[in-house]
């Protein structure tokens, strides 16, 4: 938390990798960020088309009024259920809003509540999120390209690369991003526009004769962040969980801790 230069809930993994590299006296790390954005590796590429298709098939008179939606959201929250279910009716008809629903942890109404609870006078409407993201996708040929652009702008650039920057620098590690390369982008985009189905496996197969077999055949490994365990560890098991997903509680915890360190 002391080394954060902006609040984030997603930097723990990059920090851990950088810290481990530092301990083992490594100087440079490679990261594959950018691959999921270009090769449609995220769930959003399958979910958003399905969400928008289903929500636009519903009769117009089934749209719930804001009054009932807020009641529904409150019910979901009180019972520690996923409030995004209510958000489907409000944000599920267009690719831009469905993307926000897919990527965000909280609904805009919940964010406003969090800001107010932390004595922040900023109104969520002042951020002009919806108009901005709607303008971003105007003129794109198809939904896949729209999602690629949104993933690159709002997740890769606004979050992942920022997290990689401060977490690696705070551990004196150089983090290289070979897939975030303008020349590589220009080579791939025409294939995407032509609707040729390409995935990360196709990129990997390009190196089948250039990589040692023990690397080429090695199974992918990964790890997840134990949000619940971390919260209990930081608070001596005194944390009162409010949400169905511990990552939501972890995000608020990171936000509040960042503010407290910033004040000091």
Question: What does each model-found stretch correspond to?
Answer:
Residues 1-5, 72, 243-246, 250:
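Short intrinsically disordered, low-complexity coil segments enriched in acidic
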Residues 1-18, 44-52, 190-195:
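ATP-dependent adenylate-handling ligase core
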Residues 3-9, 75-79, 238-240:
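A polyampholytic, Gly/Pro-enriched intrinsically disordered region
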Residues 9-32, 156:
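ATP-dependent adenylation/nucleotidyltransferase module used to activate substrates
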Residues 28, 83-264:
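Adenosyl-5′-phosphate
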Residues 34-36:
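Catalytic metal-binding/acid-base residues of hydrolase active sites
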Residues 38-63:
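A mobile, often basic/glycine-rich helix-loop segment
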Residues 58-81:
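Alpha-helical "lid/cap" subdomains adjacent to substrate-binding clefts that gate access
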């Amino acid at each position: 938390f002391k080394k954060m230069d902006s609040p984030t809930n997603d930097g723990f993994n990059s920090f851990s990798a950088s810290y481990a590299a530092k301990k083992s006296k490594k100087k440079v790390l490679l990261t594959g960020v950018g691959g999921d954005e270009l090769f449609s590796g995220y769930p959003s590429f399958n979910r958003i088309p399905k969400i928008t298709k289903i929500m636009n098939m519903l009769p117009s008179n089934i749209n719930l009024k804001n009054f009932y939606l807020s009641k529904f959201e409150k019910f979901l929250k009180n019972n520690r259920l996923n409030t995004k279910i209510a958000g489907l009716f409000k944000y599920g008809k267009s690719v831009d809003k469905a993307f926000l629903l897919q990527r965000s942890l909280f609904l805009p109404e919940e964010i406003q509540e969090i800001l107010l609870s932390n004595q922040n006078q900023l109104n969520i409407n002042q951020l002009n999120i919806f108009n901005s993201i709607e303008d971003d996708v105007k003129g794109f040929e198809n939904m896949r390209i729209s999602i690629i652009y949104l993933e690159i702008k709002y997740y890769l650039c606004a979050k992942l690369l920022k997290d990689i920057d401060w977490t690696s620098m705070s551990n004196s590690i150089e983090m290289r991003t070979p897939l975030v390369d303008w020349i590589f982008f220009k080579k791939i985009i025409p294939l995407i526009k032509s609707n040729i189905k390409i995935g990360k496996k196709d990129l990997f197969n390009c190196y089948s004769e250039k990589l040692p077999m023990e690397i080429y055949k090695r199974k992918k490994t990964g790890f997840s962040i134990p949000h619940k365990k971390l919260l209990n560890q930081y608070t001596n098991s005194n944390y009162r969980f409010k949400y169905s997903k511990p990552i939501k509680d972890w995000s608020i915890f990171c936000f509040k801790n960042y503010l407290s360190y910033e004040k000091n």
